[in-house]
Amino acid sequence: MLRIFLLCPLLFLSACGGSDKRQQVGIESPSTVEDEIESTPDSFDATFADGMTGAVFQHYLKLRTALVNDDGGDAAAAAGNLSESLGEDYPDLKMAATVIAATNDVAAQRAAFGAMTEEIEPLLREGITGGTIYKQHCPMAFDNAGADWFSDAERIRNPYFGDRMLTCGKVVATLE
């Protein structure tokens, strides 16, 4: 009888908690996934007629990457470096870079980045001597007004939405 009395609780515990069937719930977050964090390459395929244009494009890529990663601090630093790299012949481009460098607010930086992209296009178009720069477009940016950006790769990494819509966009032109 004592034996049955001791075995009953053991059977009860093993019956209630001994199941190997476990429900697994996977949570996938579209935000910070290690593989999706964009990085700026140390070099790119495009070559330019002068060192200033190459430096400006490198800082532009770092700025774009910071916006893709929703990193206002890195975006401000890259914009400051871009502004310092510019000559005096590009006051509107320099102003857009200064606006971005003056804040860590990613939404404000993205708005100024759209204006910067419009201003930087003639510099890149006139200065590229080799390789390819991809002009990309997101039709949903700024309440469906759309906005462009430049990239050193054909792969879409959207600076206007970051990880919320990382691959929204398409290549609309190439500069060669």
Where are the language model's segments positioned?
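N-terminal start-of-chain detector that recognizes signal peptides
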Residues: 35-39, 46, 107-112, 140-141
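Post-signal peptide N-terminal segment of mature Sec-exported envelope proteins
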Residues: 24-48
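Short, intrinsically disordered, charge-biased short linear motifs at domain edges
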Residues: 2, 116, 120-128, 152-157
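Sec-dependent bacterial lipoprotein signal peptides
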Residues: 1-14
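Surface-exposed, polar/charged faces of alpha-helical domains
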Residues: 47, 51, 58, 62-84, ...
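Bacterial signal peptide processing site
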Residues: 16-20
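Amphipathic, charged alpha-helical segments and their helix-to-coil junctions
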Residues: 131-176
